[in-house]
Amino acid sequence: MRSEIDSLFPRSIGKANEDTANYEERYLLSEADGVSANYEGYIQTLHNTALIKIAQSHNLIIRVQFRPGDFCIKGNILAHFWHLDASPSVDEDTDIVAEIRACFAMGHERTVHQNILFLADELVEILARALSPGVNDPFTAINCMNWFHSSLKAYSVADTPSPYRYDEAGDMRVIAYPVSFDRFLSVICDQSRTYVASDRNTALHMMSILTELAAGCEHPERKMAFKHQLDLLYAAAQSQLAGAIDLEDAKAHYQQALKIIADPSLFDREKNAQRWIGGRA
């Protein structure tokens, strides 16, 4: 999953400039043409390079509305586009719609290709099954959480790429918003919290992961997002853990976590002490 994040968030993608940052004010969806889906299913692949070439050849700006992993119903608008030249003929517009529609590959199931949320959902499903009463395998769940840790770390340090894509001449051609950090964090933490909070070992392990991520994060908003997830996890653990000792352990970890997040020097000392943050060697 981490390698997929690296491929979806390349460092070379350009950033928005003054002209593109306020595109919503100049290019209104009400004035755009729409490309509707001919049938329903999951978006499995989006041919980004072809979209840019189509936009360049017809002098368009294309706004993608569905990304890989989204479920699309017949008639939904897959993309909008604006003509930068004079209005084309009806036949030309029909050809443009067909070309753009062909860039969206659809199927009955989601796939891993271009879809980082699919991988996150798969791990959450494995974790949930591992912690179900009939299985009760917290070690498999902890293994899933370790991969969550790696992926969240990669997301937290990555620069979210601009949604604006340019052709070789430097003209903006395609607008396609990536999966945000907040969305990715929510998919992992919000979907798994109920299961994680019900077991002492997994609850404490996830607390340590969120503490380490928050304490080591240099992005203020993302740091607070990690802390917020820690708060939610502790609140859930308070209501779901049954044993008095387990509740005391959760409380002790949470109180120490708040101190570590607030004081970077304490974070370093805790790592060096080889207790519950960082490695154990």
Report each predicted region and the residues it spans.
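Inter-helical turn/loop segments and adjacent helix faces that build the functional surface
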Residues: D85
